């Protein structure tokens, strides 16, 4: 039983304080009430004098001035056409900040306000809305509604996909009722300055046949909507007056019985606000917290004050103060009240005969005696209604006075089950003005509904959908003022954010207004990586900015969904390396891996985190404080990484980068004072968008350091200026102009056109075009005495193949050195020693030595994990470990070849002499190698010709990495032995510092800087891929260094750069301005080939057959930049292959059929030796080609702070490519192979004219000059492609496979050209051998309808669980399981320290639970995943990271249309799994909004679509278990994708690629060559990503991203118009 602290029941309204705004206006507080007592309105109770201008409590407290003249009421304004355009408007900022209101044209006069406050029933005439239906059931809007509201309605229920059959208007109630053809009812209501539109949860029965207003009629009142059919059927739905308004807006009006009748109240930020009707502004009523504002069964308004007192805001009475928190309440029409309180997650019901009566505790139980854990309560005149923690509804007769318990009976909800599903949940109760009770319910998708309780008051029936609604609400006085300029960060493409009153605010570009986010912070800073970071309670967290839409429920309950992206910030996981106990008070961030923090002692430390992990890269570096005086208030870094510190006395100091980053300079480092324009009075410190130092003394001036001078600006406090187009947008637009193509009407096929003139390609656009002289110099000849480029390229290639790359010599030499060290180490006799893990565990260095011991453990763990990874990699290749990870003790014995050395016994001897741990994976594997006589063969590098490295060894570098790790473990053994000498002696700081220094030198220097470690950490395992990617990097370094390089020439054209320097600058700004899912790529391609044909003579065919064949090779280099989650993703790619081709062609002279004369008859003699021979020739050809290509790529991530330096290094050409790559992080190396087969056909019709250059009848060789004009057609008849690749990173491996079956007619093209050719032909007895070359001018139009499928499987090294993982899991479980037992257990788990123990407790409790909701399903799945991860991590294994099946189409119609073979298959085999088109069609059939989105995506031209499928949860869980138990490998996972029943639709993505490519194709005389360079960009047009719950077939919801997610111009204009009127669209 709870203790009740009694207070006097009387409560003056001046004590009634504002209440907390519920998380949503739907979470009503199920309150109680007492008898009604006279109470004055909150405004009349002395909150301010009505005769004086009211002061706005929100914002900075500025006053609102009364106006001498005012416009009409909002209702009248809305009824007058064009009023919003003609009325003068005050600046919005004055309203947001609570400043003076210059004009208030939309609110009533003071006299009208007085009438309203005093409860007069006089009302303004209803607005004329003029909503009608046309003959197709589409809404037609007149001018009666506000323009902005009309726009929003047109964008939602006004769409074509929403046909209506009946409409009724109630002008007195400002209400429109609608019925659609499915029987769903809609209502649009206006009430003063509020507008809502919503629809019924269920559907009414509709008559058969064609529906219209002739056979369906509607009638509506504020209380009810009735639908009648000509057949006599009728259905009615309660509207319950203002109840839906109150639930949707949170605005409640005092009843007429209250002295403040008509006064409007609402909650905002935990406070109670009242509407000042004279000015139409919400004003805070009191500083006391209130929550759960709601109307109760007696029609009066109640709220909970300070969480412990129930207050009747209408009568002024209050309950006793409860010692426990009030979680729900209720009051009935008889004045009886019920209160639910909660302590330790257990609730207690209290009943009171009147609000101020002594509470009577009542126990709740079922008939079988089981307790009921109540979450919501409601009292009617006769019954007690309870909703429990599972959302189940119960009822019991109202307990009589003194009854200690109530026996509950489950309520019957068949009608609600039929509409919302059996798994719906009752979450609360609501009441209308007449005290009628309705239940609040949530369906499976989380949408909220109001449900009338039926005639018996106990069985809920379907009512109205509150989630799928449109709500326009007056927020004047509640909206956020713009933060001060000194507290604002401009994040460029991510908009603006600011810090105000301890909360991060963001600028909503859709409404042109500042809004508060849920993120709290004491500091908001911009890192040098241009990312935002917050400091709160000693934790530094990166901010992520949302660029997706809100979540939309799947189904047809998204009528009022308006796609829009609000750039809302959210805080990520706290950066590692600091604890809350450190009391960090200030920060300066380079990036998420490097930052400086000031702790509670005032000391500064530089923290470094290993990229991609939560491990520290080095111990925190204490920074010097010499010369720095006073207590540090704030710190920052400028663009040169100069560190600035501001003390609390307003003095500013600086320390150069070299002095604070280099520990060797710390002793001599000295902070220097900075002279400022406000000397000694600096109040705030920061940087501008270019990271220049910025200071302020007050809110009026900002001083920015520019060089040695200061620039002073006076912020105007105005809304941000419209953002200028991003450079990336500008370049994309330019490339779009250069890309010629369009979509064929009524199809999804795009045709693209390309032009070439005399071998020069890229003539498609004359607007984006390089000079011919520049292109000739770049591709063909440099007009200097240098060796021609093609010859030099070939010579370099031969040299590199034989001797490797000079820049990689440090890697070659280090391999040799490490092998020599290994031999030297193992040649020394070693005695039996304790393993390293045990040695470290036994160390006792006291509290001061804990950091040293922890770093020893971390380094040992790194080395053991690294050696295990290398050994497993080698083991898989050698057959000692199978695909599933199981060890094969038999191995694959083999003999060594010339110069090879077996590393296995040498490595094993070294490991046994310096054992790592008793469970060392590497040592176990090496013993298996030795025992099974399976060698680890490696050829030592030498200086001999062609032997600098072994390019045939697929794991040469991985083997050397194992050697390095083994040697490092031996060195760590020795260091640990020396540290062990200090164990138990309580060593001093000097001795510990010496050991720490030595450990750091080993870890970061000898080991960390080793070139073999760096290369293998990037993912390189062999020299072949290393040299390929090195070649790619080197190629682009040359490309951007040389102004006349082909890549530079085309890049300057695309960037419209005047010089190379200008191009590099524009390249930086373009890359930095890339938005999410945008990329830019620079391409260089060259190739050559040889071909021959033979004209066969003497055949019976009507035409001479021409067989032919050829071989060609091509190499392609690509450098791409794309926007990633943590910066800019960079990819260097090189691909190339050989293509073999055979052909068969023929032609026939059709002159006689077209002209009536043969070619011979039309021949004209020029002279005795030469003649002119015209003809019309029809020809055809069939060719088959087979291509084998290699792919290599290097991917890594750069922060925005690193990118400019990286591009400078790329273009300078003065640094080694390895140093350039060292700037990046999270590298991965990709190597793959592609095999493709194509069967093509072509046909041509040409008008030709030839002149024999040799004498007539010359034999056996003749020469001809021929000109022709003609048309061509070609098609790709058959094609098949198979490819596979592996991308290897330090912590992850990704396998990609693509095995595309034979596909028919993927491509077709038509062209026209004019050609001049010359050559010779040699005649033999069997036929003729032609040798011709040609030059042409032509245009080609190609249609592409290719389909490509691939499967991607990602494995990630399992990391041991950390506190953040358990925190995330408990948060998920806490929100999903709200029964007291689970809640109490989770509370206990949060207090535990060890993740292993926490996981064990959670497993014990949740192992046997079955998910009842989607949230519980997700929670249990997360728990299972962490279990697998923790188990695998303890064995140094990998877990499944990502797995998906993607299908890409260039024909967008295939998104919803099956191909021919699928259609035939569906007819022949009924058991076939659904195709992608089948899946999508099924979804859009149930979801009109999604259908509209897909249709809009398909309307794009020159676009491609990618459909991704993923494994269902149960299948994925099976695979994860199989990987854990080593029963499933890569091939088993890929095999599951062959059964479509294992898959679900993950996403639909449509993107657009634009490109400018320029180059030359040289005329061919047996041998031909080509050279091209290009710039391309890719942009996401739209992505629909799906989320699933327990139902793995039908999505629960979806989100939008890309262009499709952004609000259209009509919507943003409407939102801005509303904002100007002080109105907002909720949601």
Swiss-Prot record:
InterPro entries: AvrE_T3Es (IPR021085)
Induction trigger: Transcription is positively regulated by the alternative sigma factor HrpL.
Keywords of this entry: Secreted, Virulence
Family statement: Belongs to the AvrE family.
Protein localization: Secreted; Host cell
Motif (WxxxE 2): 514-520
Major location (coarse): secreted
Domain notes: Wx(3-6)D/E motifs are required for pathogenicity.
Gene: dspE
Paired cysteines (S-S): none
UniProt function note: Major virulence factor that may function as a water- and solute-permeable channel dedicated to creating osmotic/water potential perturbation and a water- and nutrient-rich apoplast in which bacteria multiply within the infected plant tissues. Required for plant cell death in N.benthamiana leaves and leaf cell death in S.tuberosum. Essential for pathogenicity. Does not suppress callose formation.
Cellular component per GO, a single term: host cell
Summary of the knockout phenotype: Mutant does not elicit plant cell death in either potato or N.benthamiana.
Protein name: Type III effector DspE
Motif stretch (WxxxE 1): 464-468
Region described as Disordered: spans on this chain: 22-102, 436-464
Record note on what altering residue 514 to A does: Retains cell-killing activity. Fails to induce necrosis
Segments carrying motif WxxxE 3: 660-667
The keyword Secreted is annotated on this UniProt entry: yes
Biased composition (Polar residues): 22-44, 59-74
């Amino acid at each position: 039983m709870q203790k009740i602290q009694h207070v006097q029941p009387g409560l003056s309204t001046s004590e009634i304080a504002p209440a907390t705004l519920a998380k949503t206006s739907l979470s009503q507080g199920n309150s109680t009430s007492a008898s009604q007592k006279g109470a004055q309105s909150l405004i009349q109770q002395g909150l301010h004098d009505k005769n004086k201008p009211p002061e706005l409590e929100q914002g900075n407290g500025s006053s609102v001035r009364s106006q001498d003249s005012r416009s009409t009421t909002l209702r009248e304004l809305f009824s007058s056409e064009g009023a919003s355009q003609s009325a003068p408007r005050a600046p919005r900022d004055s309203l947001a900040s609570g400043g003076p209101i210059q004009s208030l044209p939309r609110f009533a006069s003071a006299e009208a306000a007085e009438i309203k406050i005093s409860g007069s029933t006089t009302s303004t005439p209803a607005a004329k809305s003029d909503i009608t239906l046309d003959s197709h059931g589409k809404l037609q809007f007149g001018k009666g509604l506000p323009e902005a509201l009309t726009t929003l309605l047109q964008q939602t229920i006004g769409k074509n996909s929403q046909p209506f059959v009946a409409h009724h208007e109630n002008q007195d109630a400002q209400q429109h009722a609608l019925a659609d053809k499915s029987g769903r009812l809609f209502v649009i209501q206006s009430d003063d300055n509020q507008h809502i539109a919503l629809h019924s949860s269920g559907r009414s029965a509709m008559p058969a046949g064609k529906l219209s207003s002739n056979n369906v009629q509607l009638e509506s009142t504020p209380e009810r909507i009735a639908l009648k059919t000509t057949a006599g059927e009728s259905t009615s739905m309660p509207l319950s007056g203002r109840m839906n308004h109150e639930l949707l807006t949170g605005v409640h009006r005092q009843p007429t019985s209250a002295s403040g009748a008509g006064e409007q109240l609402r909650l905002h930020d935990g406070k109670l606000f009242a509407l000042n009707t004279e000015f139409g502004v919400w004003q805070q009523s009191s500083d006391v917290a209130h929550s759960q504002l709601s109307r109760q069964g007696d029609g009066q308004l109640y709220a909970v004050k300070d969480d412990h007192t129930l207050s009747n805001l209408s009568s002024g009475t209050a309950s006793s103060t409860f010692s426990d928190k009030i979680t729900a309440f209720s009051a009935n029409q008889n004045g009886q009240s019920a209160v639910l309180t909660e302590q330790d997650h257990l609730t207690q019901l209290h009943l009171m005969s009147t609000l101020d009566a002594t509470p009577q505790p009542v126990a709740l139980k079922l008939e079988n005696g089981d307790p009921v854990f109540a979450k919501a309560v409601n009292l009617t005149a006769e019954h007690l209604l309870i909703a429990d923690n599972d959302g189940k509804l119960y009822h019991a007769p109202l307990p009589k006075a003194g009854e200690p318990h109530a026996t509950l009976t489950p309520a019957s909800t068949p009608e609600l089950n039929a509409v919302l599903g059996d798994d719906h949940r009752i979450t609360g109760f609501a009441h209308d003005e007449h005290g009628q009770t309705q239940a609040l319910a949530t369906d499976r998708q989380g949408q909220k509904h109001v449900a009338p309780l039926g005639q018996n008051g106990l069985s809920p029936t379907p009512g109205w959908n509150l989630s799928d609604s449109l709500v326009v609400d007056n927020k004047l006085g509640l909206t956020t003022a713009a933060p001060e300029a000194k507290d604002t960060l401009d994040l460029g493409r991510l908009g603006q954010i600011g810090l105000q009153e301890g909360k991060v605010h963001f600028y909503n570009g859709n409404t042109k207004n500042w809004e508060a986010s849920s993120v709290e912070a004491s500091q908001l800073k911009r890192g040098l990586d241009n990312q935002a970071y917050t400091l709160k309670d000693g934790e530094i967290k990166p901010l992520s900015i949302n660029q997706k839409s809100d979540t939309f429920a799947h189904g047809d309950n998204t009528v009022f969904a308006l796609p829009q992206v609000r750039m809302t910030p959210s805080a990520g996981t706290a950066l590692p390396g600091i604890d809350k106990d450190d009391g960090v008070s200030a920060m300066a961030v380079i990036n998420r891996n490097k930052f400086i923090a000031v702790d509670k002692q005032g000391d500064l430390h530089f923290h470094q985190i290993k990229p991609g992990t939560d491990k520290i890269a080095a111990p925190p570096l204490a920074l010097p404080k010499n010369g720095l005086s006073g207590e540090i208030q704030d710190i920052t870094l400028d663009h040169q990484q100069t560190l600035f510190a501001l003390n609390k006395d307003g003095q500013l100091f600086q320390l150069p980068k070299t002095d604070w980053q280099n520990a060797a300079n710390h002793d001599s480092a000295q902070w220097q004072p900075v002279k400022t324009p406000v000397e000694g009075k600096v109040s705030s410190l920061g940087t501008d968008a270019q990271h220049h130092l910025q200071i302020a003394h007050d809110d009026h001036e900002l001083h920015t350091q520019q060089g040695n001078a200061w620039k002073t600006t006076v912020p105007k406090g105005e809304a941000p200026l419209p953002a200028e187009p991003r450079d990336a947008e500008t370049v994309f637009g330019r490339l779009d102009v250069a890309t010629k193509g369009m979509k064929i009407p009524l199809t999804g096929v795009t045709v693209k056109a390309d032009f070439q003139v005399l071998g020069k390609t890229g003539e498609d656009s004359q607007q984006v075009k390089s000079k011919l002289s520049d292109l000739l110099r770049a591709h063909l000849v440099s007009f200097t005495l240098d060796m021609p480029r093609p010859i030099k390229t070939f010579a370099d290639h031969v040299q590199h193949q034989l001797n490797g790359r000079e820049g990689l010599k440090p890697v070659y030499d280090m391999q040799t050195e490490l092998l020599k060290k290994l031999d030297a180490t193992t040649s020394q006799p070693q005695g039996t020693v304790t393993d390293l893990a045990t040695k470290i565990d036994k160390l006792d260095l006291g509290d001061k030595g804990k950091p040293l011991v922890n770093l020893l453990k971390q380094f040992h763990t790194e080395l053991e994990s690294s050696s295990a990874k290398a050994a497993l990699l080698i083991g898989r290749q050698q057959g000692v470990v199978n695909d599933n990870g199981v060890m094969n003790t038999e191995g694959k014995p083999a003999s060594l070849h010339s110069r090879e050395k077996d590393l296995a016994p040498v490595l094993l001897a070294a490991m046994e002499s310096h054992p790592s741990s008793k469970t060392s994976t590497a040592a176990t594997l090496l013993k298996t190698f030795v025992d099974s006589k399976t060698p680890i063969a490696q050829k030592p590098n030498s200086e001999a010709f062609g032997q600098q490295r072994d390019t045939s060894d697929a794991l040469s570098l991985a083997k050397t990495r194992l050697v390095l790790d083994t040697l490092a473990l031996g060195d760590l053994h020795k260091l640990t032995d020396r540290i062990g000498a200090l164990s138990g002696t309580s060593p001093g700081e000097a001795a510990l510092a010496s050991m720490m220094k030595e450990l750091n030198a080993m870890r970061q220097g000898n080991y960390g800087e080793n070139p073999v470690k760096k290369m293998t950490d990037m993912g390189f395992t062999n020299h072949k891929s290393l040299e390929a990617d090195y070649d790619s990097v080197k190629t682009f370094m040359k490309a951007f260094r040389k102004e006349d390089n082909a890549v530079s020439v085309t890049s300057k054209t695309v960037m419209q750069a005047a010089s190379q320097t200008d191009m590099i600058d524009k390249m930086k700004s373009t890359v930095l301005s890339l938005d999410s899912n945008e990329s830019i790529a620079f391409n260089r391609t060259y190739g050559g080939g040889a071909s021959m044909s033979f004209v066969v003579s003497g055949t019976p065919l009507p035409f001479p057959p021409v067989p032919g064949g050829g071989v060609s090779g091509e190499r392609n280099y690509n450098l791409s930049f794309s926007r990633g989650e943590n910066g800019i993703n960079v990819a260097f790619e090189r691909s190339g292959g050989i293509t073999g081709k055979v052909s068969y062609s023929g032609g026939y002279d059709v002159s006689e059929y077209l002209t009536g004369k043969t070619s011979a008859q039309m021949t004209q003699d020029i002279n005795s030796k030469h003649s002119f021979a015209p003809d019309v020739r029809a020809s055809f050809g069939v060719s088959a080609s087979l291509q084998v290509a290699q792919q290599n790529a290097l991917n890594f991530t750069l922060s925005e702070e690193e990118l400019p330096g990286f591009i400078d290094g790329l273009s300078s050409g003065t640094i080694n490519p390895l140093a350039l790559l060292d700037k990046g992080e999270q590298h991965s190396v990709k190597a793959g192979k592609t095999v493709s087969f194509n069967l093509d056909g072509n046909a041509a019709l040409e008008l030709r004219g030839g002149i024999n250059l040799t004498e007539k009848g010359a034999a056996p060789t003749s020469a001809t000059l021929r000109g022709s004009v003609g048309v061509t057609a070609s098609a790709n008849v058959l094609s098949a492609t198979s490819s596979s690749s592996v991308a290897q990173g330090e912590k992850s491996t990704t396998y990609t496979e693509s095995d595309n079956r034979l596909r028919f007619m993927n491509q077709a093209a038509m062209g026209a050209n004019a050609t001049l050719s010359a050559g010779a032909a040699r005649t033999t007895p069997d036929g003729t051998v032609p040798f011709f070359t040609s030059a042409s001018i032509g245009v080609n139009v190609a249609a592409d309808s290719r389909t490509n499928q691939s499967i991607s499987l990602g494995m990630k090294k399992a990391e041991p669980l950390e506190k953040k993982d358990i925190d995330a899991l408990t948060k998920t479980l806490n929100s999903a399981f709200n029964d007291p037992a689970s809640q109490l257990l989770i509370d206990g788990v949060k207090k535990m320290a060890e993740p292993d123990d926490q996981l064990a407790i959670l497993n014990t409790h949740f192992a046997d639970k079955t998910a009842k909701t989607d949230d519980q399903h997700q929670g249990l799945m997360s728990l299972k995943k962490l279990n697998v991860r923790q188990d695998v991590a303890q064995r140094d294994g990998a877990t499944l990271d990502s797995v998906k099946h993607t299908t890409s189409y260039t024909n967008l119609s295939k998104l919803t249309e099956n191909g021919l073979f699928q259609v035939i298959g569906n007819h022949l085999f009924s058991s076939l799994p659904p195709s992608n088109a089948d899946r999508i069609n099924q979804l859009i059939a149930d979801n009109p909004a999604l259908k509209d989105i897909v249709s809009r995506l398909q309307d794009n031209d020159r676009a491609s679509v990618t459909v991704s499928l993923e494994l269902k949860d149960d299948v994925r869980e099976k695979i994860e278990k199989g990987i854990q138990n080593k029963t499933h490998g890569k091939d088993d996972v890929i095999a599951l994708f062959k059964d479509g029943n294992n898959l679900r639709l993950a996403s639909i993505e449509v993107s657009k690629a634009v490109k400018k490519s320029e180059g030359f194709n040289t005329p061919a005389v047996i041998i031909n060559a080509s050279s091209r360079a290009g710039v391309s960009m890719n942009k996401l047009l739209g992505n629909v990503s799906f989320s699933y719950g327990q139902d793995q077939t039908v999505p629960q919801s979806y989100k939008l991203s890309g262009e499709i997610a952004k609000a259209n111009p009509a919507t943003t204009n409407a939102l801005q118009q509303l904002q100007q009127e002080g109105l907002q669209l909720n949601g």
